[in-house]
From Swiss-Prot:
GO terms for cellular component: cytoplasm. It comes from Aspergillus fumigatus (strain ATCC MYA-4609 / CBS 101355 / FGSC A1100 / Af293). The keyword Zinc-finger does not apply. Pathway: Mycotoxin biosynthesis. This is 3-ketosteroid 1-dehydrogenase helE. Its cofactor is FAD. 3-ketosteroid 1-dehydrogenase; part of the gene cluster that mediates the biosynthesis of helvolic acid, an antibacterial nortriterpenoid. Protostadienol synthase helA cyclizes (3S)-oxidosqualene to (17Z)-protosta-17(20),24-dien-3-beta-ol (protostadienol). The synthesis of protostadienol is followed by several steps of monooxygenation, dehydrogenation, and acyl transfer to yield the final helvolic acid. Its EC number is 1.3.-.-.
Amino acid sequence: MAARQLRRLSLPTHLPLPIRPHVRHLGTAQTNCHRFDHETDILIVGSGAAGLTAALRSHFHGLSSLVIEKDAQIGGTSAYSGGGLWIPNNPLAVEAGIIDTPEQAMTYLISVIDADTAEDTDVRRASSPPRKRAFLTHGPHMVSFLRDRGFAFRLSPGCPDYYPQAHGALPTGGRSIEPDVFDARLLGLGEKWTEAIRQRPGRSLPLFTYEASSVTRMGASWRDVGTVLRVLLRGIYLSRVRGQIPVTMGKSLVAQLLWLHMQLDQGPVLTDTALRQLIATPEGVILGARVATPDGERSIRARCGVLLCAGGFAHNQGLRERYGPVPANAEWTSAARGDNGDAIVAGVRVGAATALMDEAWWGPTLRDPVRGMYYFALQERARPFGVIVDSSGKRFMNEAEPYTDAGHHQYAQKAVPAWFVFDWNHRKRYAVGSLMPRQQPPAQALDAGYIHRADTIAELARQIGVNEKGLEGTLARFNEMADCGVDSDFARGESAFDNYFGDPTVRPNPNLGAVRTPPFYAIPLVPGDLGTKGGLLTDEHARVIREDGTPVQGLYAAGNTTASVMGRTYPGAGATLGPAMTFAFIAIDHIASEHV
């Protein structure tokens, strides 16, 4: 595929793709009412991991597909992510001898998703038993399908389920996988591949997710320094010795899927092409969509169906304020800029039901002291020598708990912002965002209030407007518990998930360390997210459904465009992308069963 195919492309004004003899289309009577500029079997809205997976599966079934992307670059939030997939009983785990079954995984999902949700209609509809079973059944097949075509995955060793003490959990890992390192030269774009796939600012190393915890605590032990050296040497060897452009995580995920897409000659991904509205018959059958291109609006006929997988509404301030908890700020999200709810709004306009619109993949988020951008604080808060407090100076959560739970607790406590308070022991051992161990905070970060520093706790409390006596009392109690290694208040450090992001050199509890060594630091934390998790209701076939449970014929959805099968929880690393790609896979299989 030439570089120009990934840039601004207009749609042809003719119908270049004939209706294939083996495909039953929706009938010419309905289409006579509409003039279409382009035809395809399946229109896929969104070029993230779900959309590209759907395109590959379409080709497998002999169906043509057209992927449209509103932004100039492809990949969406998938390209920003760690690239992990949570897929119970996945083939890599089976090959590694890890014991898991669909029944055990179902027990786990029921334990963590359905607890205390008897009155929660949204969870019961979004995470129905048939949808859970569909995910668990088809997830391993989706992974095998991609591997058979050349996609390189690897296990994320030791990454536990996020609720390792729940029934059915795998405390030592096995359900999370991620992309292997990929040579972006294979895309044929040279150094310009960065113009095709969405990038975060700054240069990245070929780092795997399971190495990140060690790399960011490089000041704690020589073993962690060794991990840093291994990553650096990997990058030097692959780039300078072998002449590769090595990428990992979300960039590898999207790049590998794009590369496979290119091998099949499925046609280009049309960038700068935004969904405007779905086109339906008077009876509500979806015929295609109206889209905006650099050359004006065009209509696309989707003979077999439309798949919406264009993300959620993380950057839509109006929708966030309408549906979600407040205060809300679209700037706090880690999702891609184009994540503004277009696909969800389009679905609602043709009768789709919604659920979980008040939810997101929450997590405490800070302003990076070096780069100034919002940063999802995954590891910093789990480390010893720090606490999170509200304005009264009181702790209100297990700081190392799963991030979506932490976001829920922050809103429940009305702690917006909350404050992450830590000392020099934390500062000299661990990175905080892009601020490396022992690195002094930039003056502009101190001036802007991204980070605060003081020689005493009392002075720090006055700087950040937190109750002085409350904070001193909290730290006195916390330090006693840290010395004993037992958090009697919130059980921090008692689960394998907590320990995964802790510091194994700190004993007796790798997540607890007293906050008593000056200087002291504080960083404001807001309830950011990795994207929203509410959206269109879908069934076990990924069909979009109405309030009465009937499907909107010809309309499918996957990923953050839908109400998540994970309900209000986050069961394990990759619980966003795993279901997104699986339900995109399911959608295409169902379309094929209806039309091929």
